[in-house]
Amino acid sequence: KNLCNTRWNVDAETEDPVFSAISDDEKQAIRQQLVPVLVSLASASTPSQAILSQMNESVALVASSDFPEAWPALIDELVSQLSTDNHHVLLSVLATSHAIFKQWRSQFRSDALYSEINLVLGKMANPLLELLQRMHGMLLDPSTPSMTMQPLALCLMLLLQLFYDLSAQDLPPQFEDAIPMLSPMFTSLLSFSRPELIGDEEDVAPSPLVKIRSSVCEIFELYAKRYLDVLPQLPEYVQAVWDMLSTYGPSEKYDVIVSKAIGFLSAVVRMGNQRELFQSDSTLEQFCTAIILPNIQLRDIDEEIFEDNPMEYIRRDLEQSIEIDTRRRAACEFVRALLEQFSTQITTICSRHIQMYLAEYQASPAQNWKRKDAA
């Protein structure tokens, strides 16, 4: 991996006289073996995740330089493994594919980029959709053995991330045609649950199910912002996300999913053309009491973070440019989105709660100082 990182492309003017660039013949030999070695390692009876992660990154590093011109066979090699029943191999191939394609999310549009994406879509889009449907069916099947639920969930999470990668620049025709099939699949993942995927209540790390739902919310937000004209199912997405949000408490392990879900709702509110979904006073009141107030208030864990590292806490709380999913930031952005579309209504509702919180603080400052902070 380090060799691919430091010696794959070396400028002749800065080339190290001791460690020179890899020759073209050596590169060709390495390219021919990277994916087969990855598959071989993943097929072992007890595959080493540490080694597999290095191999995943090695393939991605070489692909960033050589795909597709010098390595046109890469996609065929990866796609050929999507039909395997070995979950370890599937996980490695999907993780490698995501490592290669995730860079598309932030790249500027260009003819070369679109040619690369179209090449991948032509070979991978339909197998990806078939695998997504298969993994979804197995995950929701009550007869699926418990021991396979974790790898299935990880595969599905990576498939959702790949779906986002391939949609980030433009809407693939294959995905557009599949939206009627995909929409009920995606919304079902926001209500589906299995004990094996929930995780330990004491664990602060997001569970596999939370990661899956976070990926679904990211896809919903992307498609709502970019491809609304082919998305008549948007009201169903909003209802599914709203119903899911009500099931999550204040635990730190749910911070990412709550932030992603609120981010999606903020994006839909800002559109303006979806006003009828939110404009009733009762809906806006529910937004305030069920989303804004609970997530804008300080929790015990927030106090602990502040006590351990106050500067870092303030930076996370105030700095808008850093990409950190915090509940308070998501709730504040949701208020701003509502103000853009329902200024009078939301000001009246929020002002009432602000006055109530300040009155509670005045009645008992030592006990209710968090109310003042929230106000």
Where are these predicted regions, by residue range?
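Eukaryote-specific detector of the first structured module of a protein
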Residues: 1-2
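Internal alpha-helical scaffold/solenoid segments in large eukaryotic proteins
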Residues: 53, 68-83, 140, 144-148, ...
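Alpha-helical repeat/alpha-solenoid scaffolds of the HEAT/ARM/MIF4G superfamily
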Residues: 8-142, 146, 169, 251-374
